[in-house]
């Protein structure tokens, strides 16, 4: 979704929200949470508040008029009823008779609500320096996580990674072969954005940065001589990230056409640009997601930008066998998250079984 459209949809949701949600929004914007995350959270709050109205747990016609004390006095049974509603309600916009949403969707909804309740009961301060209320019903609500061993998860992910020579083969494919079967119209669009798209793919594969970190890169954040970029990690922390050398020619090629191709002025600080209505704009996350999906599906298998992050992490662990190094590269505070990559590249167990 383009940034302008995303902000427009956020404004539409903000117009119907209670005052305390608007305060929450401003607080999380300062963290900073991404606009995409806040948009998804606002949608979850709308769904929850509409359920409160339909269930007669609040006697107001407008969501904006929902009082704060309604949230304070919600019971565990109320929240369990909401979860059951999510499990059993008919799916919308789907050609299926199946009811209910997935457990992943339910967990996402509960995560959004937990964030709001934590803000109201722990983080915000009233005039007396106290939170708005203390009773956090979300702490009594348990979520059901998908049961899967690291080995099983690793095996599933491994099929969607471009390991070994496939990293460069993927970039070469986009560079030289992807355009062969395109229509004239598609070819024109591809050629206009080819250098930019290759630079984005190469950066993701060579640094392992998150999608949001790539989107928010500014010109001043990129040092092509040192092959280091400055990014804003989760929680707003700034971090220096090394970039593998194979990305340099792609990044330099993009820089060579950036100003003229996208009509960039000195005020256009975003590193990766798109053109919208003849004007340069910072490329949005949705455009990168669609671009990665398009090229990867044509090459081998449809993947997400996050799988390119997994690809870098797996290749780096395979080369160094250092979880600490991989953790630092990805911006993780500890090595627990990187346990997955040891399973992806660990063939010792399979080799031992082959000897039986």
Swiss-Prot record:
Regulation affecting activity: FtsK is required for recombination.
One cellular-component annotation, GO: cytoplasm
Enzyme active site: 210, 234, 306, 309, 332, 341
Compartments where found: Cytoplasm
Keyword rRNA-binding: no
MF annotations from Gene Ontology: DNA binding; tyrosine-based site-specific recombinase activity
Any single GO BP term: cell division
InterPro entries according to UniProt: CB, DNA_brk_join_enz, Integrase-like_cat_sf, Integrase_catalytic, Integrase_recombinase_N, Integrase_SAM-like_N, Recomb_XerS, Tyrosine_recombinase_XerCD
Residues of the Tyr recombinase domain: 169-354
Pfam families: Phage_int_SAM_1, Phage_integrase
Keyword field: Cell cycle, Cell division, Chromosome partition, Cytoplasm, DNA integration, DNA recombination, DNA-binding
Domain Core-binding (CB) intervals: 16-121
Function: Site-specific tyrosine recombinase, which acts by catalyzing the cutting and rejoining of the recombining DNA molecules. Essential to convert dimers of the bacterial chromosome into monomers to permit their segregation at cell division.
Sequence similarity: Belongs to the 'phage' integrase family. XerS subfamily.
Record protein name field: Tyrosine recombinase XerS
Species this chain originates from: Streptococcus suis (strain 05ZYH33)
């Amino acid at each position: 979704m383009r940034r302008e459209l995303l902000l427009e949809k956020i404004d539409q949701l903000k117009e119907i929200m209670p005052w305390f949600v608007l305060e929450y929004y401003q607080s999380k914007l300062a963290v900073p949470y991404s606009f995409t995350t806040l948009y998804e959270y606002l949608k979850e709050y709308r769904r929850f508040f509409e359920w409160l109205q339909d269930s007669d747990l609040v006697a107001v016609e407008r969501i904006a008029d929902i009082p704060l004390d309604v949230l304070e006095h919600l019971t565990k049974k109320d929240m369990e009823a909401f979860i059951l509603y999510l499990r059993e309600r008919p799916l919308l916009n789907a050609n299926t008779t199946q009811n209910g949403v997935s457990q992943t969707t339910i967990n996402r909804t509960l995560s959004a609500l937990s964030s709001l309740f934590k803000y109201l009961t722990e983080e915000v301060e009233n005039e007396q320096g106290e939170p708005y209320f203390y009773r956090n019903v979300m702490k009594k609500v348990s979520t059901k996580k998908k049961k899967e061993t690291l080995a099983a998860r690793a095996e599933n992910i491994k099929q969607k990674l471009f390991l070994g020579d496939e990293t460069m083969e993927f970039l070469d494919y986009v560079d030289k072969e992807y355009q062969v079967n395109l229509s004239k119209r598609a070819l024109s669009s591809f050629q206009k954005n080819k250098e930019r798209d290759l630079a984005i793919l190469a950066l993701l594969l060579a640094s392992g940065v998150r999608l949001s970190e790539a989107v928010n890169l500014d010109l001043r954040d990129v040092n092509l001589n040192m092959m280091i970029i400055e990014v804003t990690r989760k929680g707003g922390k700034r971090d220096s990230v090394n970039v593998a050398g194979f990305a340099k020619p792609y990044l330099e090629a993009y820089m060579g056409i950036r100003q003229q191709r996208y009509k960039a002025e000195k005020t256009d600080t975003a590193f990766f640009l798109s053109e919208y209505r003849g004007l340069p704009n910072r490329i949005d996350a949705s455009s990168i997601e669609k671009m990665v999906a398009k090229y990867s599906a044509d090459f081998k298998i449809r993947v997400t930008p996050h799988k390119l992050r997994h690809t870098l992490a797996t290749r780096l662990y395979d080369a160094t066998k250092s979880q600490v190094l991989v953790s630092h590269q990805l911006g993780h505070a500890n090595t627990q998250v990187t346990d997955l990559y040891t399973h992806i590249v660990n063939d010792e167990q399979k080799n031992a079984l082959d000897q039986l």
